């Protein structure tokens, strides 16, 4: 049992729980920063000014979702 305690202590010293991302660290909780990082449709490099849209199908996804330009 003491070996298990030593192993647990070593693991907690090497990987403290504070190093793990918590729910409060997610970008969802910081909308102001999200808005600064967000690119509007008109400024998107694939946005066609004449057609007012991107070419379809969407050439790329951001975090598994379509870019804002393609969603219109």
UniProtKB/Swiss-Prot annotation:
Propeptide feature ranges: 20-49
Disulfide linkage: 53-69, 54-67, 58-70
Cellular localization per UniProt: Secreted
Top-level taxon in the UniProt lineage: Eukaryota
Tissue expression as described in the entry: Expressed by the venom duct.
UniProt keyword terms in alphabetical order: Amidation, Cleavage on pair of basic residues, Disulfide bond, Neurotoxin, Secreted, Signal, Toxin
UniProt xrefs under InterPro entries: Conotoxin
Modified residues (Leucine amide): 71
Signal sequence coordinates: 1-19
Gene Ontology cellular component terms for the protein in this record: extracellular region
Gene Ontology terms for molecular function: ion channel inhibitor activity; toxin activity
Family statement: Belongs to the conotoxin M superfamily.
Role according to the record: Shows a paralytic effect in fish.
More about this protein: Found in injectable (milked) (IV) venom.
Comment field on protein domains: The cysteine framework is III (CC-C-C-CC). Classified in the M-1 branch, since 1 residue stands between the fourth and the fifth cysteine residues.
Record's protein name: Conotoxin CnIIID
Organism (species): Conus consors
